[in-house]
């Protein structure tokens, strides 16, 4: 799940977006490595931060660096085999599957989502406008952030017991309860009107993908994405798993439980490694791939700075276009940035989560991009 406040999110993205453009780009791996190491060490000095993994893909060359310890005093620095929860960055992979399904002619962005459901759900339409596939992709459906409603606001309390409260709620919830709750949702305006982040919407999208393609989301990921791209360590984890790295919430000394993922896993379910994330990033830099091209098409804009593609945040200025997504659990946070104009992608992952973590990570991205992309030329 992702709980970064909208104002903070917008400020961070505008800061990064202003750096992208027609410029001289550093591709020498030793220079890139030095930049990453300096930025990573600085991030590691932040309070409560135990570790960081950074990957940079630039000009077809990859630099990966790992910092700190996953558990204080144990000397266990993360490495290329460390498996992380990537939370809402999962949504970008779901977006890729949707683009693949649309490209195959099996799904349309204008399809009424009710046509894929087993009950009529008359509550999913306002003034004659139903929730459509495009609305689920762009968080404009009007659905709440989470179903059940009890999940909403838990993270924003920022209390020490957040990981355990949320985990308990997850364990008590399943698909049957999801459908019951979906029938009680009351939309306040026609879908497509307002952006409001919704993991519930992406879970519904995952269900629809399973119906249309007649296979599980797990199998679709394997066939369409992770298999062809050699992402052997990228999995959709449903229910608890002990295979992911331990993470920490705010000042807590005890680790947070991993996501339970009792639904379809389309909102937060993927776990992966840094090398696999960079393989996914390399795919996003392939302008010749028709599925990638489609998945980067803007589906919603508010007429201002917010543009949304297939689950990607899209940012534009006079220097070009970039794509990004944040993911956060009660124990990890990560950002994935794609800068096609500079053949550049950056992934950062830390096993700490708190209200300031995302901002600190983006300051680190800022330092890296500023060194690698010289906008003065």
What kind of feature is each model-predicted range?
Residues 1-8, 12-84, 100-108, 134-145, ...:
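N-terminal leader/targeting segments and the immediately adjacent pre-domain N-terminus
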Residues 24, 69-71, 112-120, 151-155, ...:
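Short linear capping/connector segments at secondary-structure termini
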Residues 24-68, 210-213, 218-223, 227, ...:
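Catalytic loop of the DD-peptidase/beta-lactamase superfamily, centered on the K-T-G motif
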Residues 45-53, 73-135, 189-201, 265-268, ...:
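Short active-site loop at a secondary-structure junction
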Residues 85-88, 103-152, 184, 207, ...:
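Active-site helix/loop module of the DD-peptidase/beta-lactamase fold
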Residues 136, 205, 277-280:
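Structural scaffold positions in well-ordered secondary structure
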Residues 136-137, 182, 294-295, 299:
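A generic structural signal for nonpolar/aromatic side chains embedded in well-ordered alpha-helices
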Residues 176-188, 249-261:
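The feature captures the short pre-catalytic strand/loop hairpin that immediately precedes
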């Amino acid at each position: 799940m992702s709980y970064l406040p909208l104002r903070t999110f917008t400020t961070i993205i505008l800061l990064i977006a202003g750096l992208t453009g027609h410029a001289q780009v550093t591709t020498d791996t030793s220079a890139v490595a030095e930049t990453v190491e300096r930025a990573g060490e600085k991030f590691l000095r932040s309070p409560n931060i135990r570790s960081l993994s950074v990957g940079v893909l630039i000009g077809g060359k990859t630099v990966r660096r790992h910092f700190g310890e996953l558990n204080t005093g144990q000397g266990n620095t993360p490495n290329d085999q460390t498996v992380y929860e990537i939370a809402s960055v999962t949504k970008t992979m779901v977006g890729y599957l949707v683009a693949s399904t649309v490209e195959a002619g099996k799904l349309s962005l204008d399809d009424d989502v009710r046509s894929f459901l087993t009950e009529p759900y008359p509550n999913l339409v306002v003034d004659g406008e139903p929730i459509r596939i495009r609305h689920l992709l762009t968080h404009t459906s009007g659905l709440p952030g989470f179903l059940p409603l009890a999940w909403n606001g838990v993270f924003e309390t920022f209390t020490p017991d957040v990981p355990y409260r949320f985990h308990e709620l997850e364990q008590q919830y399943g698909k049957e309860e999801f459908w019951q709750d979906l029938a009680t949702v009351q939309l306040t305006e026609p879908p497509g009107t307002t952006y409001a982040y919704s993991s519930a919407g992406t879970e519904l999208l995952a269900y629809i993908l399973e119906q249309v393609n007649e296979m599980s989301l797990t199998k679709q990921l394997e066939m369409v994405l992770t298999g062809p791209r050699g992402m052997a360590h990228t999995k959709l984890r449903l229910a608890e798993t002990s295979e992911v790295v331990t993470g920490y919430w705010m000042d807590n000394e005890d680790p947070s439980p991993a996501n339970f993922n009792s639904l379809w896993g389309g909102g937060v379910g993927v776990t992966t490694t840094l090398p696999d994330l960079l393989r996914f990033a390399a795919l996003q830099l392939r302008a010749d791939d028709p599925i990638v091209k489609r998945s980067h098409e803007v589906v919603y804009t508010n007429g201002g700075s917010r543009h949304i593609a297939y689950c990607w945040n899209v940012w534009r200025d006079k220097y070009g276009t970039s794509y990004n997504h944040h993911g956060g659990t009660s124990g990890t946070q990560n950002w994935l940035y794609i800068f096609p104009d500079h053949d550049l992608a950056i992934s950062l992952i830390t096993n700490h989560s708190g209200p300031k973590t995302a901002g600190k990570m983006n300051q680190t991205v800022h330092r890296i991009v500023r060194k690698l992309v010289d906008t003065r030329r």
